[in-house]
């Protein structure tokens, strides 16, 4: 099987025999039932391939779709004038790049259709007049496809980069936003000349005028009809890649069922609507099947620096954001004047929907899968703690220690890790800040550890332990105290009854109390009962 890794052109995929997960039934529904759309999906999730597929569909290239679902649905195969802008390939941290790109594309189209544009008009105004001309010239309304519309904003988001304009200086974030607003708001006036419009991107910026006023696009990002339009569903994985999964299982010397479970835990877990359709990360799945190895393919392709910048100056830690139910208004629209990173984290693919409550119409958000847990949390831990030691390396050491039933290695590994955190990073003046720092540090460590071993979250009437790990032979119950004693931690395990559910268990139950010092920043006492 040939995997289209790095290939986003639909014609190339079809002509050269690469595997294609058939999304054309949804594509037909999209084109048949509406006109102007916006779709938000994380990077490398198939948006560009969707745009490319639509381009060839509206070009009437029927032969490319032979044998696909749309082949039996479409009967006309009309050709339409297509205007396609892809913002993917440009670096918008360079001043005036966005303006030159839009102006250049409009001028190219004017030459293509023999239209003399007025240089005194803005690119948006020239585009409106061009659409009207082409509609009249061809007798066909136009198709506009804009891929990664928000990249000019994401490139400069939350930076201090500036652009000089006449005798003034503006933040590039503001300048690029105003440029996009001018372009998008202008061509919205061309409604009568448009057959179909799709904008794709990572983030829905509420302050870009395409999402306000008349003729605004229908946002299908959370529409259950289209929740599987990008990515790979469980059914698609099983039907299209059944034999490939079996071959991968054979190479890794696991059963086919274990292989499917490994793929699910590492790459599944995305949900884009209240229907809770399971969606696998397509980029990682294709790479894993191609190389027959479980690796963090998607996360390695790009560090989410804009997210790190946002998180670095917000009072909200990741543990404040995960595991909570939200109204859609809290995580769908990103507003640049509000210092809440939640919408950006969700839409970038680092959080996803994990449950839906129909009574409150609210959504539970959490990390989607092990690839994201390990990569994103390690990145945050490195920036938050400032340690030279990798939190992932620590998690592996803790995992290996549990496998060997060696708690002394646990103690030594934790001690060394905490000792590597610079004093300037852990210095907190207020007691509440010290406590918050302490708990967030352990949240990051144990969420990363959970990608290697299952951490039990058993809620008791009196609360729950800081960490419970179950193996085939042992149960480990940890309780941590900041500026307390190990005896106090052990006493809490007894008083709260954390071990009670395991009284009839044949496995050995090991209770560990650990105290940390906010002054030294490391372990003071370690006792086992």
Predicted regions and their residues:
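Phosphate-binding site recognition
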Residues: 1-434, 449-450
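Active-site metal-binding core of divalent-cation-utilizing nuclease and nuclease-like domains
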Residues: 134-138, 445-472
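Structural motif
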Residues: 143, 474-476, 510
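Mg2+/Mn2+-dependent nuclease catalytic core
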Residues: 166-178, 482-499
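Metal-dependent nuclease catalytic cores in nucleic-acid-processing enzymes
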Residues: 183-190, 343-351, 440-447, 492-512
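Conserved catalytic cores of phosphodiester-cleaving nucleases, focusing on short active-site segments
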Residues: 442, 465-482, 496
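C-terminal accessory domains/tails appended to large, multi-domain proteins
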Residues: 453-454, 472, 481-483, 497, ...
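Domain-level recognition of nuclease-like catalytic cores that cleave nucleotide substrates
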Residues: 501, 505-529
